[in-house]
């Protein structure tokens, strides 16, 4: 087990994302995790990400700490 503090996180450019800051909390490079990774993203109003669920075999989980988030599927349906 490895403890990571917020001050240790480093921002990175997330492909297909805009108006946001992405930081990886746990993953291969950060803590040695091999089968998953955990990120922390902060989106500005109007920020977002392109639809990329078919190109990525990883499942995604979003937990909104503050504000709200709209997800649109490939057909444009909002959730």
In which residue ranges do the predicted regions lie?
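Generic detector of leucine side chains in alpha-helical contexts
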Residues: 6-9, 40, 44, 58, ...
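Glycine-centered flexibility sites
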Residues: 19, 39, 46, 67-69
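A short, N-terminal "cap"/entry segment at the start of jelly-roll beta-barrel domains
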Residues: 1-37
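Conserved hydrophobic/aromatic beta-strand scaffold that supports enzyme active sites
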Residues: 3, 22, 38-42, 61, ...
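Conserved short histidine dyad/triad with adjacent acidic residue
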Residues: 24-28, 39-56
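A short beta-strand-loop-beta hairpin characteristic of the jelly-roll/cupin
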Residues: 48-79
